[in-house]
């Protein structure tokens, strides 16, 4: 045999393939008979072994096994039995044939709070007060906030008075220091409006006048007291003569003048 037949010649890249020969060489896979369920189950591996990309065999496997698998009725199980508890129970039943000891009962599902944790939470939620017993912490905070003894107390350095706010203490200290001084007579006052009313006694200014009798007053408070004399309601009554007065000061003047006891 010539040696040229044993040497492989390189293929010509310009040569076109014969597609008709390739089509004849293809083998057509057709099923001449209906599917055999047992044959498919034996031939197709379970989905855990198959590649996740192979979706068609997985679908066939699931569709064939769905009518055969009996679903577990979880709704009929008690609430305390979880799927883990069911597995433990089945394993203990299988092991009971191998060992002589009776199967242990399934352990109940662990609760979210034990007795010790519940007692500790209850102890943290309540606080003890002398004379009041156990009180919730929220009520205890409110009672402490409302208790004057729990607040900070401000003491006056001139006297023994105590105040709960710094502003009230500052207003009280002005009654000791008397910062408002009259330039005419040197009299001192704790408030500016008191000094202003005092200065009007020197100047003779009376800006507040009565609309009933045209009397004028240097201070507005004196005008209010005067207007009570024009009112019909007289609340202050003399016990001796049954005479009524609109102001307590007028009643005192009446008693000091010497009430005879008869009506006037």
From Swiss-Prot:
Disruption phenotype: Embryos die early in gestation, exhibiting defects in gastrulation and mesoderm formation. Recessive lethal mutation. The modification Phosphothreonine is found at residue 203. Pfam families: zf-C2H2, zf-C2H2_6. Residues 10-40 are annotated as: LATS2 binding. Its main location: nucleus. One of its GO terms (molecular function) is RNA polymerase II transcription regulatory region sequence-specific DNA binding. Residues 2-7 are annotated as: Required and sufficient for interaction with KDM1A. The modification Phosphoserine is found at residues 11, 82, 92, 96, 100, 104, 107, 111, 115, 119, 246. Residues 85-116 are annotated as: Disordered. Keywords: ADP-ribosylation, Cytoplasm, Developmental protein, DNA-binding, Glycoprotein, Isopeptide bond, Metal-binding, Nucleus, Phosphoprotein, Repeat, Ubl conjugation, Zinc, Zinc-finger. GO terms for cellular component: cytoplasm; cytosol; fibrillar center; nucleoplasm; nucleus; pericentric heterochromatin. Interacts with LOXL2 and LOXL3. Interacts with FBXL14 and GSK3B. Interacts with BTRC; interaction occurs when it is phosphorylated on the destruction motif. Interacts (via SNAG domain) with LIMD1 (via LIM domains), WTIP (via LIM domains) and AJUBA (via LIM domains). Interacts (via N-terminal region) with CSNK2A1. Interacts with EGR1 upon TPA induction. Interacts (via N-terminal region) with LATS2; the interaction is dependent on LATS2 kinase activity but independent of SNAI1 Thr-203 phosphorylation. Interacts (via zinc fingers) with KPNB1 and TNPO1; the interactions mediate nuclear import. This is Zinc finger protein SNAI1. It comes from Mus musculus.
């Amino acid at each position: 045999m010539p040696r040229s037949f044993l040497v492989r010649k390189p293929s010509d890249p310009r040569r076109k393939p014969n597609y008709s020969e390739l089509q004849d060489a293809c083998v057509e896979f057709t099923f001449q008979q209906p599917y055999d369920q047992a044959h498919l189950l034996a031939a197709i591996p379970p989905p855990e072994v198959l590649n996740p990309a192979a979706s068609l065999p997985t679908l066939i496997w699931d569709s064939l096994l769905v009518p055969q698998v009996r679903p577990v009725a979880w709704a009929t199980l008690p609430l305390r039995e979880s799927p883990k508890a069911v597995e433990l129970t089945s394993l203990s039943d299988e092991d009971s044939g191998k060992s002589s000891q009776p199967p242990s009962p399934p352990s109940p599902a662990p609760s979210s709070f034990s007795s010790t944790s519940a007692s500790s939470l209850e102890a943290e939620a309540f606080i003890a007060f002398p004379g009041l017993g156990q009180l919730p912490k929220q009520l205890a905070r409110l009672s402490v906030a409302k208790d004057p003894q729990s607040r900070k107390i401000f003491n006056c350095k001139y006297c023994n008075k105590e105040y709960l706010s710094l502003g009230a203490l500052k207003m009280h200290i002005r009654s000791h220091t008397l910062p408002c001084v009259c330039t005419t007579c040197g009299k001192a006052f704790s408030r500016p409006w008191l000094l202003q009313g005092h200065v009007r006694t020197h100047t003779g200014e009376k800006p507040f006048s009565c609309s009933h009798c045209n009397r004028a007053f240097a201070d507005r408070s004196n005008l209010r007291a005067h207007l009570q004399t024009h009112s019909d309601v007289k609340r202050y009554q003399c016990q001796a003569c049954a005479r009524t007065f609109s102001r307590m000061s007028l009643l005192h003047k009446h008693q000091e003048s010497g009430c005879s006891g008869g009506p006037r």
